[in-house]
Design a protein with these regions (language model features):
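Conserved small/polar residues in nucleotide/adenosyl-binding loops
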Residues: 122-124
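Acidic-histidine catalytic/liganding microenvironments
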Residues: 12-14, 48, 113
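Short helix-capping segments at alpha-helix termini
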Residues: 13-14, 73, 98-102
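Short active-site oxyanion
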Residues: 15-19, 52-54, 104
Length: 124
């Protein structure tokens, strides 16, 4: 999912990719290919920069920790669904967005929905 977000950012005239946070070896290759900094964790990123916004496309079990860290830093988050792997964690994420008065958007794409896919066939 992260790669799809990167492609969308690259096509945008309103956004740019600042950096990547990734612990896997693929992150090294990707950051070199895209010519953007790579960080091994969020703590290092936040010590050096404050992004305008972030996209979190990590394994579900990491959603709470990662999202809350950015929200506490007042950084808006686009979080890929599901919001979390359990209700308690989901509530913590939502409460963090509210208490920090910071935007939280849950990504819910419809790229496999036939109705959405056929919208391009309509000529208005």
């Amino acid at each position: 999912m992260g790669l799809q977000h990167i492609k969308a950012i690259q096509k945008s005239k309103l956004a740019s990719l600042h950096s990547i946070v990734e612990i896997k070896k693929t992150g090294i290759e990707l950051s070199k290919k895209l010519n953007v900094p790579l960080y091994k964790n969020i703590k290092i990123l936040l010590a050096k920069h404050k992004p305008d916004a972030v996209i979190i496309a990590t394994p579900n079990v990491l959603h709470e920790t990662d999202t809350v860290r950015f929200l506490k830093s007042k950084i808006p988050v686009l979080l890929e669904k599901p919001i979390s792997d359990n209700i308690k964690s989901a509530k913590k994420i939502i409460n963090s967005a509210r208490s920090n008065k910071t935007s939280l958007l849950i990504g819910y794409h419809r790229r496999h929905n036939s109705i959405v896919n056929n919208l391009s066939l309509i000529h208005i």
